[in-house]
Amino acid sequence: MSRIFITGSADGLGLAAARTLIHDGHQVVLHARSGKRASALDELASRSAGIVIGDLASEREIRSIAEEVNMIGRMDAVIHNAGVYQVPERGNTPEGHATVLAVNTLAPYLLTALIEHPKRLIYLSSGMHRGAGDSLQDIDWVQRRWNPTTAYSESKLYLTALALAVARRWPAVPSNAVDPGWVPTRMGGPGAPDDLTLGHLTQTWLAVSEDAQALTSGGYWHHRKRQSPARAALEPDFQDQVLAKLGELTGVSI
């Protein structure tokens, strides 16, 4: 039996992963953005190992989330599932960051740095990361004209690079990125063509399976098959530049 923390587990793929893991007998620590969203998890929460509440767009609340998770105890796996898509405006988090960058990239970066090293790390990427450029100028969209699709693609490229950088820097902690496909969740929309019932299975497999493939590190996965991510994400120099930029924006180093 494993203990797993899943961000964004109030709905969509995070909720599906939580249900599957709890059904299989694992201890799952749930996460919801607000008390209102947490209240919808009453039935599942009663069978979970706890529920942590906090907005991943706020660095203060991210730190609180990390503290609560650490108080529960060391995790066997952390699934960085939470994300936002097609945000119509840049937004402005309490720290002044673009909302998409804050939730999709800065939050998992900070949680990776602040939560005690788990036995496994899983980061939910997207095939759209391949459409992002590899420039790290103005990643927070301070000067550029806002483009929701580009911002999302870039945030997932940085996240993929983060996953592979952690795999390289922390060899004792298997770290992998997952493309769940375009699935009909609240974020993906009702017209998404992929199968919702399959979208969470790779990350749950990576979190708990003793299969030799699931114990490997530095992979980019889609439906339990390793694929090639964008070339930039594989390059150690780019990975290190991403970590440096994220460290600069958050004041926290990995």
Segments predicted by a language model, with ranges:
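Conserved N-terminal Rossmann-fold NAD(P)-binding element of oxidoreductases
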Residues: 4-9, 31
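N-terminal Rossmann NAD(P)H-binding glycine-rich loop of SDR-like oxidoreductase domains
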Residues: 10-12, 16-18
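Catalytic loop of short-chain dehydrogenase/reductase
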Residues: 83-89, 98, 120-172, 179-192
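Rossmann-fold cofactor-recognition segment
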Residues: 45-60
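Conserved glycine-rich Rossmann-like NAD(P)H-binding loop of the short-chain dehydrogenase/reductase
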Residues: 24-39
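C-terminal helical subdomain
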Residues: 177, 193-244
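Active-site Tyr-X3-Lys motif and surrounding loop/helix of classical short-chain dehydrogenase/reductase
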Residues: 67, 89, 93-102
